A protein has these predicted regions:
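Short glycine/acidic-rich loop motifs that flank beta-strands on beta-rich extracellular proteins
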Residues: 1, 14-21, 28, 44-52, ...
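Right-handed parallel beta-helix
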Residues: 2-15, 29-46, 68-79, 99-110, ...
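Short, recurrent motifs enriched in small/polar residues
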Residues: 26-27, 94-95
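Acidic, glycine- and Ser/Thr-rich low-complexity intrinsically disordered tracts
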Residues: 111-205
Length: 205
């Protein structure tokens, strides 16, 4: 809980951001991640290095998989082959629905399957408000699951969850496209964050 991802850029990866719940974690479910003011674009790169679990997020901007009480706000999310933002239940040893997530005031465009989506059984209290987008699964998702309105049980659409489970099966034997990090050119030197320059001036290097 209380993880803040703010004013950052995520692009040309397999997937953008994917807060998720696994039974192997210390205190599941995942909860209270704040994704605010980021640029998340073009995360469809099959050649990016990846583990099996990373491959599951391929082609998505933000995936909340079995997470609770997360906030996705004021982001630009563009050009993804599957979903811009999807809130979905997930299955590990246990079934983990997604509850109480808020998607607000984002620009979400050019997603091939849907810009915003909700999938899975028993998801409650997820809301969508003031987002600019073109497509949603199910249709009418923001209108009927607005943050200031009553909840309508649209989240019973299962297409997103089945898509994820199909990819789990597909990648279970390690047979999926990925790059080798050892062959990538080293990136150019990047500027430090201002706080790091200040710490280094005190000898913390």
């Amino acid at each position: 809980g209380s993880l803040y991802i703010i004013s950052s850029v995520f692009k040309n990866n397999k997937g953008g951001l994917a807060p998720n719940t696994l039974d192997s974690e210390l205190l599941p479910p995942e909860r209270e991640t704040f994704i605010i003011g980021n640029l998340i674009e073009n995360n469809n790169n099959v050649d990016a290095p990846a583990t099996q679990s990373t491959n599951l997020s391929l082609g998505n901007g933000v995936v909340i998989a079995g997470g609770n009480n997360n906030v996705i706000k004021n982001n630009v999310i563009a050009n993804h082959n599957l979903y811009g933002v999807i809130i979905t239940a997930t299955a590990d040893v246990n079934y983990w629905p997604a509850h109480g997530n808020r998607v607000e005031s984002n620009l979400i465009i050019n997603s091939k399957r849907a810009d915003i989506a909700s999938s899975g059984l028993s998801n409650l209290g997820n809301c969508f408000e003031n987002n600019y987008f073109n497509t949603s699964i199910p249709p009418g998702l923001q209108t009927l699951n607005n943050c200031d309105s009553s909840f309508y049980p649209l989240s019973a659409d299962l297409s997103g969850m089945w898509s994820s489970l199909a990819r789990v099966i597909q990648t279970s034997d390690g047979n999926y496209s990925q790059g080798d990090w050892r062959t990538f050119e080293a990136p150019a030197n990047q500027p430090n964050m201002p706080i790091m320059d200040e710490l280094m001036s005190f000898g913390y290097d």
